[in-house]
Amino acid sequence: MTEASARTIGPLPSRFSRDPKTPRSTDNAAAALLLAFTVLAILWANSPWAQSYSIFWDTDVAVSFGEYRAELSVKHLVNDGLMAFFFFIVGLEVKSEFVIGELTDRSRAAVPVVAAIAGLIVPAVIFLTFNPSGPDAQAWGVVISTDTAFLVGALAVIKPKFPARLRIFLLTLAVVDDVGALGAIALFYTDDLKLAPLAVAALLIAALAMVRRLPSLRGPAYAVLGFALWIALYLAHVHPTLAGVAVAVLIPVFTPERRQVEQTVDLVRAFRQSPNPQYARAVTRGLRESISINERLQTAVGPYVSFVVLPIFALANAGVHLDEQTITAAMSSTLTWGIVAGLVVGKFVGITAATALMSATGWGQLAPGLSLRRVAGGAALSGIGFTISLFIVDVAIEDPARQDEARVGVLIASVLAFTLSWALFRITDWISPPEPVGLTLVRPVDPERDHIRGDPDAPLVLVEYGDYECPFCGRATGAIDEVRTHFGDDLLYVWRHFPLERAHPRSFDAARASEGAAAQGKFFEMGRELFAHQDDLEWSDMYRYAVAIGLDIEQFDQDVRVHASKVLHRVRDDAQDAEVMDLNSTPTFFVNGKRHKGPWDAASLIRALEAGR
């Protein structure tokens, strides 16, 4: 077995793919189920049993407690009750993105954030040009939202070439989009506030913020207080689904700490040697608490939202009566065409124009491997505004006939948005086919950002994607020294992180430590220490290496542990580039921007660089 083949492993762990949002077959299945229930609702509402559709969803459900009594129709129970779980999941994703996800890098996040804001404003403006006044003008909120579930499924169906970065961009955009839509519901679609229940809701939110301090039973506490908050908001006449967002935002999220994971592994070994209830409880608790409750809830609740809540919501809300009268009325309705224009044209123009502006002015930058034409295809797909659009139809429009016209507009817009996106991806891929993944360096060398050795203006550039726990990368350091000696000032050497945790569980933490050293100008000095002690890469060891190379240990601790988001994102950013290029082994070299294939001993690298002169 060759060294290269010995180091080849499977794809990156999901940590580098925005965690729960990595491409999964369940995403496609959830979107297909949502579509199936949408079609079922339309067929039911237009079948000989159409009357039963209205009767069932309009049936009142009464809940009484002593002298208190509340009545909700089945449809409102779905929209106000079950949909709180949908907004809960959205809120968890929002919190995760801002704390440990794409939105931690403000320059990278700026483009999708501004594009999302434009994608909220431009559709609303276009809608209001069709409906400037009257009751229909209140429905402007219908056109501001993108359906994340359908977006993910539709992107999988269209299958644009190399969609990894586009998918991250669109999901980041969708998070901000959801925040805007939820804010619109809170500010513009809530009236007749009751102050006493609202005060109780504020106290409950304060209590929720303190739950994280409990030593145990935090999950049940979140559930009980969250349900109480839902009731308080309902009584305050604030849309109770916002309780889901409030609870989610107050739930902590963090990346797993290697030390805690290793402690749990030790407990597992102890349990294996001496099985007993005490060890069993300790192992269970250690495993549970090594992952943030935010991520655990996304995993636990998310499938129920995708496969139960959203299909039921679609069944309850998509039942548009498409008789000749409804279709005729919709085809001549400014409400219908305002929704179509807002979603299809507004989303496309707003997102694409804002992205172009941010890139042109330098106020933000697109992620590596992502171009404006790819964003344009994704912007068109963002016109699928199904879930929250139908949700706001029911909130903003009182007349059932006008509601049907609005739903027809949402359905037409979704079909047109999908068709436009498919056409854009097919045409742009045909006119300017993307290069095969991995043959060309996806992100050019940036001396201000990258870790470099040599003259930034050198004619020869050697980029290495490596792993500090990889023994072959450790051996390659000697080869790199020979290559640098051979070429002198004619060579610029660049190191980028590619920690393969599946094979090397301490490699990610080692990369973090090197970034902590980089903050004090000693990146390569720390790298030498890490390669020299590859069998000793616990945090206690790396703190010792930090002292050995003369780092300010307090500052190092702040950078890698207390304020770790910058360090985490830097390592993740390099690893995501490697994922985009479909790299699967270390070390991987790029010679003058082109992937080096073959041996990476000093003589082979020198020959490859000489050929590139």
UniProtKB/Swiss-Prot annotation:
GO molecular function term, any single one: oxidoreductase activity
Region (Disordered): 1-23
Catalyzed reactions: Na(+)(in) + 2 H(+)(out) = Na(+)(out) + 2 H(+)(in)
Stretch list, region Na(+)/H(+) antiporter NhaA: 1-408
Matches recorded under SUPFAM superfamilies: Thioredoxin-like (SSF52833)
Gene Ontology cellular component list: plasma membrane
All residue ranges annotated as the Thioredoxin domain in the record: 409-613
A Gene Ontology biological process term: regulation of pH
Bilayer topology term: Multi-pass membrane protein
InterPro entries for the chain: Na/H_antiporter_dom_sf, NhaA, Thioredoxin-like_fold, Thioredoxin-like_sf, Thioredoxin_domain
Keyword rRNA-binding: no
Subcellular location: Cell membrane
Gene3D superfamilies membership: Glutaredoxin, Na+/H+ antiporter like domain
Keyword Coiled coil on entry: no
Transmembrane segments: 29-49, 81-101, 110-130, 138-158, 168-188, 191-211, 231-251, 300-320, 337-357, 377-397, 408-428
Family in the record: In the N-terminal section; belongs to the NhaA Na(+)/H(+) (TC 2.A.33) antiporter family.
Functional summary from the UniProt entry: Na(+)/H(+) antiporter that extrudes sodium in exchange for external protons.
NCBIfam families: NhaA
UniProt name for this protein: Na(+)/H(+) antiporter NhaA 1
Gene encoding the protein: nhaA1
